[in-house]
Amino acid sequence: MSSKRTLWLLAGTVALVVVPLLMGGEFGGADGQAAELIEATVPGFAPWADPLWEPPSGEVESLFFALQAALGAFVVGLVIGRRQGAAKTREQNAPAPRSFPAE
C-alpha cells in the first residue's frame, strides 16, 4: 500500500473520530434509543424476554463490548491476511509465461 493512500486512510479515520466530538454528538447505545422509541410509541410496553445475565456494572458491559470488537477485528484481519497470503502463494507458484521464438 502506498504511503499516500495510508495517509488518506489515517486522515479519514481521524476525521470520523473528531468530527462527531466537535459537533457535540452524543454517544449512546442503540438499546437505550430503541427503548425510548418503543416507550414513546406504545406507552406501558412490557418486554416479553429478559436477559439471561446482566453485567454487574456499565464498565463490565463496556469491557465485554470492547472484547467483542477486538475479537471481530482479529477475525477480519486474519481472513484478510490469509487471503492475501494465498494470493501471493498462487502468484509465486504460477508457471512462467512461455515465450515462442520469432519466425
Curated annotation (Swiss-Prot):
Q: Matching Pfam families, A to Z?
A: CbiN
Q: Which molecular function GO terms apply here? A: cobalt ion transmembrane transporter activity
UniProt entry tagged with the keyword Membrane = yes
Q: What is its main location?
A: membrane
Q: Name a biological process GO annotation.
A: cobalamin biosynthetic process
Record field: transmembrane: 7-27, 60-80
| Pathway(s) this gene product operates in, as recorded in its UniProt entry | Cofactor biosynthesis; adenosylcobalamin biosynthesis
- Which keywords does this chain's UniProt record carry? Cell inner membrane, Cell membrane, Cobalamin biosynthesis, Cobalt, Cobalt transport, Ion transport, Membrane, Transmembrane, Transmembrane helix, Transport
> What membrane topology was assigned to this protein in its record?
Multi-pass membrane protein
Name the InterPro entries on file.
CbiN
Q: A cellular component term (GO) from this record?
A: ATP-binding cassette (ABC) transporter complex
Cell location: Cell inner membrane
Q: Which domain of life is it from?
A: Bacteria
**NCBIfam families recorded for this chain?**
cbiN (TIGR01165), PRK02898.1 (NF002780)
Subunit composition? Forms an energy-coupling factor (ECF) transporter complex composed of an ATP-binding protein (A component, CbiO), a transmembrane protein (T component, CbiQ) and 2 possible substrate-capture proteins (S components, CbiM and CbiN) of unknown stoichimetry. Subcomplexes composed of CbiMQO can be isolated from membranes but the CbiN subunit is not isolated in association with them, suggesting it is only loosely associated. Expression of just CbiMN in E.coli confers some cobalt uptake.
Function as written in the Swiss-Prot or TrEMBL entry: Part of the energy-coupling factor (ECF) transporter complex CbiMNOQ involved in cobalt import. The complex confers cobalt uptake upon expression in E.coli; can also transport nickel with a very low affinity. A Cbi(MN) fusion protein has about 70% import capacity, but the holo-Cbi(MN)QO complex cannot be isolated, suggesting CbiN may destabilize it.
Family that this chain belongs to:
Belongs to the CbiN family.
Name under which the protein is recorded: Cobalt transport protein CbiN
Question: What taxonomic ancestry is recorded?
Answer: Bacteria, Pseudomonadati, Pseudomonadota, Alphaproteobacteria, Rhodobacterales
Quick one: which gene encodes this? cbiN
